[in-house]
């Protein structure tokens, strides 16, 4: 009987030793390393330039921007003698213009669209726009009468007029849009026997989108 009890005691001890060893072996296994997350590369965005980065000729409207019945009558860079002394005083740097023409002899219909593009120092843009706007409102040259009309906002500053030339025997309607974007001042004029306010809005928006 005592032998059986000793045998059982030894068996219990061996079982306990087995579990202790098992636990010790398990705890001694190296822990799996926590994967280090790969840092996300943040690419800083390049701020948009506040001045135009393309030449004036690349900002000019193209035939593809117009209705199919228009042709290019003239286009060229502007030269210094073609701008006023006041324009020079405001820091005028360079300019470009394009003139589109549509003629339908059967209907005695002719229409002109002219775009002029002028580059000034950025700090003078408010002054340039204000002077040109007041000049249109006052009709300082005495040869035209213009009234401001509603027009979608174009670029940074914009305004539109409708009027006529005082001594024009044909009494053509004249639309004029002035707008600035970055360091660019533009003037777009539409006149003739057939003028279209909606077409003017469309091409003016296209002109603004070319300034980048």
Please describe what each predicted stretch is.
Residues 1-46, 66, 207:
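Secretory targeting signatures
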Residues 33-107, 141-154, 199, 204, ...:
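N-terminal "mature-domain start" segment
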Residues 71, 121-124, 134-137, 205-212:
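Sec-exported extracytoplasmic/periplasmic mature domains
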Residues 93-131:
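A short acidic-to-branched-hydrophobic micro-motif
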Residues 110-114, 169-176:
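Short, surface-exposed coil-to-beta transition loops
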Residues 144-173:
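Signature of long, low-cysteine stretches enriched in small and polar/charged residues
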Residues 153-157, 179-185:
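Short, solvent-exposed coil/turn segments at beta-strand boundaries
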Residues 183, 187-212:
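Surface-exposed amphipathic alpha-helical segments
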């Amino acid at each position: 009987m005592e032998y059986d009890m000793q045998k059982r005691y030894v068996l219990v001890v061996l079982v306990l030793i087995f579990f202790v060893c098992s636990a010790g072996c398990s705890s001694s296994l190296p822990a799996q390393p926590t994967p280090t997350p790969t840092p996300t590369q943040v690419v800083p965005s390049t701020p948009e330039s506040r001045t135009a980065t393309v030449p004036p000729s690349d900002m000019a409207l193209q035939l593809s921007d117009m209705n199919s019945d228009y042709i290019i009558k003239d286009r060229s860079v502007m030269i210094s003698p073609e701008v006023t002394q006041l324009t020079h005083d405001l820091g005028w740097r360079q300019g470009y213009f394009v003139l589109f023409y549509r003629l339908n002899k059967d209907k005695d219909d002719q229409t002109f669209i002219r775009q002029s593009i002028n580059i000034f120092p950025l700090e003078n843009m408010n002054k340039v726009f204000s002077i040109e706007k007041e000049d249109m409102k006052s009709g300082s040259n005495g040869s035209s009468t213009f009234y401001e009309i509603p027009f979608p906002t174009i670029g940074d500053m914009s305004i539109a007029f409708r009027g006529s030339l005082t001594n024009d025997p044909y009494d053509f309607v004249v639309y004029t849009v002035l707008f600035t974007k970055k360091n660019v001042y533009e003037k777009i004029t539409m006149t003739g026997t057939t003028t279209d306010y909606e077409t003017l809005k469309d091409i003016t928006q296209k002109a603004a989108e070319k300034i980048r």
